Amino acid sequence: MLSDRLVANTPHIDTRTRLALEQRPEQPLFLDLQTDFNDGDAAYALRYYPTAIMGAEVVGWLDTSIKSGRVPGGTALVYGSLADFPYETPSSSTIQVDFDTGDLELHYFDGWQKLEHLDARVKFHGNRLDIDVEKAAVYDSQVIDTRARIDSLTPASPLRVQGKVAGPLSNILRLLQEDALRDDFGDRGAPLRARGDAD
């Protein structure tokens, strides 16, 4: 089966797909697929994640964390034998999903302050997730030079985040009073006062 251009437009996203599905003699089906997508509504992103390569914990977290935002554009590639899908280990087969987000609202976890106005580049490559944050806001501070990674989607490994926050020092103390950190830092941070900016 071969198609150079399959177009699917929904209220949540527009897609254009190139598809080649080949049955080789005495071989499993071989898929070569590339989809370009744009004008996505991030609130409906769960319908389009590559869930076959993601652990239930990761899928659940993404489903509850992303509240709103845009997906201006991206691309998905699946290349390889369907017998090897979902390509969890390195081989001649691959699955990649790369896309941008704009003005995303992310509720990281209960008890944590949400991230707003999040612009990022998201990359699912094989069994790994990488996120390069261009900008975001927490309170009235700016999140900058930030990268996040999940080394293994199946089984799920921890989300690791490294970055910087620029803004009023008082926001750092405020963050320590949030439910997620209060037990560890609340007593120490409560009497502190701060002036000026951190960067």
Predicted regions: what they are:
Residues 1-6, 30-106, 152-199:
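Extended amphipathic, helix-rich lipid-handling scaffolds
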Residues 1-11, 20-23, 107-109, 113-159, ...:
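Strand-loop-strand
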Residues 14-18, 73-75, 119:
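Membrane-embedded beta-strand positions in outer-membrane beta-barrel channels/transporters
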